[in-house]
Amino acid sequence: MTSSRGGTELERQITTGKLLATQGYVIGVEISGSGSRQSVALADLNGNILYKARRPLEYVPDTQTVLLLLDEMLAEVTAPERLRDGRILRVGVAVGGLVDSSQGVVRTLHHAQGWDNFPLQDYLVEKLDVPCIIDNNANAAALAEVESGAASPSGEEGGHKKGERIVLYVGLGRGIGGGLVANGKVYHGTTCTAGEIGHMQVKEHGPRCSCGAFGHLEAIASAQAISRTMIGLSVEYPETEAAILRVTGARAERITAEQVFQLATEGDPIAQRIIEDVYTYLGIALANIVYLINPGLIVLGGQVALAGELLIAPLQARVDSLCLPVVGQSVRIIQSKHGSEANIVGAVTLALQDV
């Protein structure tokens, strides 16, 4: 990608990867699938985040509101006092929706209206006058885990080999998305929609998904599905209802997936039923993916992955049991290193590609 500023020496250095970490900055932008969580980060050319702005909302905003907040945050992170070692060189954007990365267009956000075929790349290029790269948030997070996270080549951890050739990242948040990195490159597929594993049908006649279909993985194993199912079933079970109030400080509507895992370990039968469904249907989905692409690592991120070994150990066992030994023995399921920051770190990582 070339800049509209022309072929300066600085831009030639960008394309040849010869820039020093003090010669400028990149910006990472995160927009969630509902548009209610946005963040903008300023980073140096080593990927170190120097400053971050966030504008979380308690509701699903319209497109104009998101853009206004985005403009505010961009102005905040690019204030002159923050740019003492150069100018902004590139922007990376991680979006929680269907993205045509080749055209820089948001096809749709998964949980918000008004974003259909929105030219976000052009919008940011016009505003900042620098090159911009845009991708799905799971793809960006996958790249971040490979470049600087749990799947990076820097050392050994937990008995698995880092620097794997094929890595699958699975974001288990409000929705479920996947990002596949093969030999250091994100695999986008024919129409840039590879990795939409949340919409794999795993249970016939299962619960309704946000997309309108039934039995999708996202409707069973996403953070939102886990919390909603727990709240919905608890009304018929006073002991479970009391347990929810206890762990949430009497704010039952705020129960998290991690807290449902906690209640399951404490022996709550409703929580155990819900979590067993997560193991079953997420295990089926991952086992099928293992058969198809034979990854070395599966990295779990998002809110559900905050459950840590309460999720990972049983899920690894489930996948192992569903795969032939010769197929499944080489894959390891691990937790994201970047955690809740994976998307914004991924956006920065996008901006640094080929720099």
Name each model-derived stretch:
Residues V106-G114:
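A charged helix-plus-loop insertion that forms the helical arch/lid used to bind
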Residues E30, G92-G96, Y169-G175, G179-V181:
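Short beta-strand segments
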Residues P56-Y59, G114-W115, T193-E196:
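A short acidic/small-residue loop/turn micro-motif
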Residues N137, G173, A347:
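Active-site glycine-centered loops adjacent to acidic/histidine catalytic or metal-binding residues
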Residues C132-A138, L180:
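General beta-strand structural signal in soluble alpha/beta enzymes
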